[in-house]
Amino acid sequence: IGFDGMSTNSYHEHRPTQVKEIRKQYSVAPKIAKANHIQSYRLHGFQVKPEKDYLMSRKAVLTNSDCTIILAAPKESTRDYFYKNTDADELIFVHKGTGKLRTMLGNLDFKYGDYLLVPRGIIYKMDFDTEDNRLFIVESRRPIYTPKRYRNWFGQLLEHSPFCERDLRQPQELETHNEIGEFLIKVKKQDDIFEMVYATHPFDVVGYDGYNYPYAFSIHDFEPITGRIHQPPPVHQTFETDAFVICSFVPRLYDYHPDAIPAPYNHSNIDSDEVLYYVDGDFMSRNDIDAGHISLHPAGIPHGPHPGATERSIGKVKTDELAVMVDTFKPLMVTEEAMKIADDDYHKSWIE
């Protein structure tokens, strides 16, 4: 943050300050349906309707002062404008779709299972290969890092880390456009979009030095940590901030003690709300869960396996589940967009 955190010096063909016009300003702030609640919810994420425009397709479903969780089903690439989020880092998980993340610091090809981390202030466009795209996005007002316990004091990932530097894909194919004209950048600031027209192409960088750049990491490259008995959720941790953590549940061996019960035990997250986004496979602890579903279990009340899930897990050797988890240290508010796709009876699904 500021002059103490990661930074990058970028070298441009032109001054990146040449604003010709500021056009529209409009709000994209999440509209809150339930600010204070204690109900567990299931959201049917694939019920979010596809929309042509990338920004218009982004539907905020859960939010607090630290982060916003967004579902998006864009059908078209961002052709007519560039985008810059000055409020938050963006972690974009690609559930469906392939294409190219084009940024001022180079391009990244993406596919199913990729996390794309775009630091705040990076100007970018999304190019999709087809119209069939599904994204799970976390906007973070706090910087997103790899977990500190995976790194030594030099910043090198240690041998017990479930991924290594080689798994993190840096931008390639630096585009340098030495062009003068009118270039529309949609800038997000304090939950408003400002349409700003610049006199020079925003992708006019000829090179850069530093540590602040976008990168990609595939959930399929996360090496699971397993044990003879049930392991706690931190073994799945992939990213962290000082306000929430992000975990990856991937195919792995179940607990292999002779008397182990693979299903998790009932537990209360007293200090955090738990959000699970179900990507693929059969999630062992849940009944009636499909790809694209989101479960929200608020802090303060217990949750655990659905009836029958514990019994079904006995004797199983492995799981093929794939899911992304976000645990926030502040309570999450439920938005109006979330209520459109919510199962209002989910909290009763543990009744036997």
What is the meaning of each model-derived region?
Residues I1-E352:
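Jelly-roll (double-stranded beta-helix
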